[in-house]
Amino acid sequence: MQITKTLVATLFAASTAFAAPTPADKSMMAAVPEWTITNLKRVCNAGNTSCTWTFGVDTHLATATSCTYVVKANANASQASGGPVTCGPYTITSSWSGQFGPNNGFTTFAVTDFSKKLIVWPAYTDVQVQAGKVVSPNQSYAPANLP
């Protein structure tokens, strides 16, 4: 009986030793400089049915691209999702979240260069963009590779 247990244990140990190797994890972070979103501001009309975002996308590898991005809604455009909008080589979309409670809302953009298969997700709090002020300092984001 003891020899049977030993043989079974040896077989289990041998089978795990020869199992197929697990592939290494692959980083999806791109080997390019961070992208800087420059001079971003949001201006909403008095009825909050339209908000215009203006900003630049600077990859530090080409001339910066200026973007004007308008989000329209029947109400609360400052909290509405928007896009897609094309700005030069980029496709821009956005979504607002209030997940952290009252007065802690924020908007996250997806800035995608499909030709280079790169994306960044810049995010700005409602406080940063209130009353049409320009966000300062500019914020930079590490691009990720699209699969």
Swiss-Prot record:
It is found in: Secreted. This is Effector TSP1. It comes from Hypocrea virens (strain Gv29-8 / FGSC 10586) (Gliocladium virens). The keyword Disulfide bond applies. Residues 1-19 form the signal peptide. Disulfide bonds join C44-C51, C67-C87. It comes from the Eukaryota. Induction: Induced during growth on maize and banana roots. Stimulates salicylic acid signaling in host plant roots.
